[in-house]
């Protein structure tokens, strides 16, 4: 069980990180199915890989930008059994980068919706190892300046931008 402290932004486009001291870590497709507001299932697959990873996760919000997340690896059979109770789902492609200058991991999620046809780009940075709360993050952390041209809004405190709220009902 880990305490998660993160900030989230909506982006206009995927940032060009070349020449900005970022190291590409991985790309993966994530399907999140919700059993309740705090309980979800995840399938994670990497491009070109046939193996999928299955997780059962519980995430409880404890403050603005803070939550406690418990994650357990499960089998495909366990996933399929639990998935029968899922009622919302979200699919995203995540690209993860390490900013060598500040040591933080930047996750850029591309969410693509069919009806209505909308694409949303979200960027998250997790801070739990360095800062205690969002006030401290806002006081001491500076997002690299070149991100200014890519950011539409800081949506950390907007529940409408939680993955749960963005998920669509399963048909």
Task: Tell what function each PLM region has.
Residues 1-171:
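Phosphate-end processing signature that detects enzymes handling 5′-triphosphorylated RNA
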